[in-house]
Structures are given as structure tokens and as C-alpha cells.
Amino acid sequence: KNKIKLFVTLSFALLMAFGNVNSVSAAKSTTKSTPYGTLKGFISPYNSGSSKLCEGGTTIGQNVKSIKIKIEAKKTSTGTNIGSTQNQHANSSGVGDTLECWGYTGTKVTFYGTHDAIHTTGYHVYTSTQY
């Protein structure tokens, strides 16, 4: 009986550990210190219906006097620009910008700028700031 219990317990543990292999992976992030607080960059693949989409962004969680956040994305294989966003923030708290890529199921997308690379399967994100 103890062997059966152990087998069931181990089987359940393995299922929990590896059962989500095909699901969307968790967001990856990195941080960078700025004069106005810590900048966080992230990349997050996610599902919407049957399409695998991606989202990249930068946020800063403290009051800022002035900061410009820019995010750009290109399809890795061809270099095709698939979107960009850039916003200037002043006297704001918890500012941030995100960029979503729609309709690029199964492709590699590169988010790029000038700082802090984040790498995850098939995606790269770089956060970029000017202040």
C-alpha cells in the first residue's frame, strides 16, 4: 500500500510539474535603476482564443518628473516592423506603456530599444528609456 501511495504521489507531482508544458509561459521581466525609480521591462506571451499573441512593455512604479518610454517590435525572421509605441509622461505615478502584437501566431517577435534584454522562448524584449 505504501508503494502505491508513493507512486500516486509521485505521479501527481510529475503531472503538476510537467502538465503545463504546452501552455503559455509566464512573463519574463528585468529591472533597471533610473533617477526616478526602478524601470521594469517585461515580455508576456498569452492566448486569446486559438491565437498565440504577445505583449511587451515598460513600467515605472514611482513618481516621475519626466520620462519617455518607447517600445518597438519587429518580426525576428524578416525584420518587418509590426508596431511601436512611445509616450512622454510628466508628473505621473506608476507610468507605463505596452505594445501588443496581434496575428503573429507561431512567429518570433523582437521587442527592442537600448537597454536591458529579456529572453524567453521565441521572444526578446528590450526596454528603452530617455529621461
Locate the predicted segments by residue.
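A positively charged, amphipathic N-terminal helix/segment that binds anionic biomolecules
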Residues: 68-70, 78, 114, 129
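N-terminal prepro-regions of secreted/extracellular proteins
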Residues: 1-48
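Solvent-exposed serine/threonine-rich low-complexity stretches and specific carbohydrate-binding patches
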Residues: 79-94
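Short, exposed beta-strand-loop hairpins at the edges of beta-sheets
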Residues: 60-63, 102-131
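Exposed aromatic-hydrophobic patches
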Residues: 93-104
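Short, surface-exposed binding/anchoring microloops in extracellular/periplasmic proteins
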Residues: 29-76
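Generic detection of short hydrophobic beta-strand segments and adjacent strand-loop junctions
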Residues: 28-34, 87-90, 103, 127-131
